[in-house]
Amino acid sequence: MTRIGTPLSPTATRVLLCGCGELGKEVVIELQRLGVEVIAVDRYANAPAMQVAHRSHVVNMLDGVALRAVIEAEKPHYIVPEIEAIATATLVELENEGFTVVPTARATQLTMNREGIRRLAAEELDLPTSPYHFADTYEDYAKAVADLGYPCVVKPVMSSSGKGQSLLRSDADLQKSWDYAQEGGRAGKGRVIVEGFIDFEYEITLLTVRHVGGTTFLEPVGHRQEKGDYQESWQPQAMSPKALAESQRVAKAVTDALGGRGLFGVELFVKGDQVWFSEVSPRPHDTGLVTLISQDLSQFALHARAILGLPIPVVRQFGPSASAVILPEGQSQQTSFANLGAALSEPDTAIRLFGKPEINGTRRMGVCLARDESVELARAKATRASQAVKVEF
């Protein structure tokens, strides 16, 4: 039986969030609605989730000693990682000492780098994936590319949001793709994965919730990426019944293997009735921002319920929906957003501005959401709203 105490009192139910981006911000809001005391931790001050948490700490989360000090001081009932760049070995130690890591410390450790999760999916669970090789040196990387052939994809084993990821079409791309992968890794230069290119029709995120009542699959989310970064997403993605059933089979296999409770974003490639596993995040997914307008319970609300051991009897879909990112390029610590009235002038639209404290280059600063009679109409509406927003530096 779940019991939630009073925030900022001796009975408080405390959640410590590791990583305070826009996804974490929505998780904090949902936890706050359920009366949970939330402590937010990230490497920089005034991150989005810090702005809505009870209190916050600025810590390099790859520093296990510093991370442990904060967790031991706060004594949270739940530790909820929101990003990959965390000292996962420390989380494993803390879990062994009695702390609860969501969904599990092992899941966080396996998914923080592409090697752990790929080997689990392909070699232990025998799930369909692209052919792949790992490489530590340029020589091994060049051999992997030669073996897999063109086109192929190279990614750092540790990165997120498409950083360091590129498509190779010929030998002319070899050096620049290697250099780009070395620059884009979360932990600096290092190991890469080279993947054979799959001739897929579309890719989906199957948001999968492990909760006290079992496993719930949300309607598949389609999305469009540029340079490995999400630009727009929509729900539901049209699929054949066979492809949907296979997607759910793959998602259940990998989330069962990871264990624990919470929402997982399972990324899959689809062609006809064929499905290939790509990646999984043991937390809400950026493409799942569309659920803020498409469902009665967003992915963030579902994550909060699952964490706390609360039931999820049903998730109601409101109809075809879409999200389109607000992705300006500039340099500022005082960004402003104008023309919001025009962006919200159509029915069934919404905007989330993330409140990121600075921009230095291209950065996702918000998202526009829309519902309509069809996915195509919803996508067009969300894109119109996004394009209407004027970003001032």
UniProtKB/Swiss-Prot annotation:
Alphabetically list the UniProt keywords: ATP-binding, Ligase, Magnesium, Metal-binding, Nucleotide-binding, Purine biosynthesis
Report the InterPro entries cross-referenced here: ATP-grasp, ATP-grasp_carboxylate-amine, ATP_grasp_subdomain_1, PreATP-grasp_dom_sf, PurT, PurT/PurK_preATP-grasp, PurT_C, Rudment_hybrid_motif
Give the binding site residues for N(1)-(5-phospho-beta-D-ribosyl)glycinamide: 22-23, 82, 286, 356, 363-364
Query: What is its pathway?
Result: Purine metabolism; IMP biosynthesis via de novo pathway; N(2)-formyl-N(1)-(5-phospho-D-ribosyl)glycinamide from N(1)-(5-phospho-D-ribosyl)glycinamide (formate route): step 1/1
Q: Which residues form the ATP-grasp domain?
A: 119-308
Q: Residues that bind ATP, according to the entry? A: 114, 155, 160-165, 195-198, 203
Q: What enzyme category does the UniProt record give?
A: ligase
Pfam families recorded for this chain?
ATP-grasp, PurT_C, RS_preATP-grasp-like
Domain of life of the native organism: Bacteria
EC code = 6.3.1.21
What GO molecular function terms would the record report?
ATP binding; magnesium ion binding; phosphoribosylglycinamide formyltransferase 2 activity; phosphoribosylglycinamide formyltransferase activity
Single Gene Ontology BP term? 'de novo' IMP biosynthetic process
Q: Where are the transmembrane segments?
A: none
Task: Provide the catalytic activity annotation.
Answer: N(1)-(5-phospho-beta-D-ribosyl)glycinamide + formate + ATP = N(2)-formyl-N(1)-(5-phospho-beta-D-ribosyl)glycinamide + ADP + phosphate + H(+)
Gene Ontology cellular component list: cytosol
**Sorted alphabetically, which HAMAP family does this protein's record hold?**
PurT
Q: What does this protein do?
A: Involved in the de novo purine biosynthesis. Catalyzes the transfer of formate to 5-phospho-ribosyl-glycinamide (GAR), producing 5-phospho-ribosyl-N-formylglycinamide (FGAR). Formate is provided by PurU via hydrolysis of 10-formyl-tetrahydrofolate.
The record's subunit annotation is: Homodimer.
Xref: PANTHER family: FORMATE-DEPENDENT PHOSPHORIBOSYLGLYCINAMIDE FORMYLTRANSFERASE
| Family under the similarity heading | Belongs to the PurK/PurT family.
This protein is called what? Formate-dependent phosphoribosylglycinamide formyltransferase
Naturally occurring in which organism (per UniProt): Pseudomonas putida (strain ATCC 47054 / DSM 6125 / CFBP 8728 / NCIMB 11950 / KT2440)
User: Which taxonomic lineage is given here?
Assistant: Bacteria, Pseudomonadati, Pseudomonadota, Gammaproteobacteria, Pseudomonadales
* Gene that this polypeptide is encoded by: purT
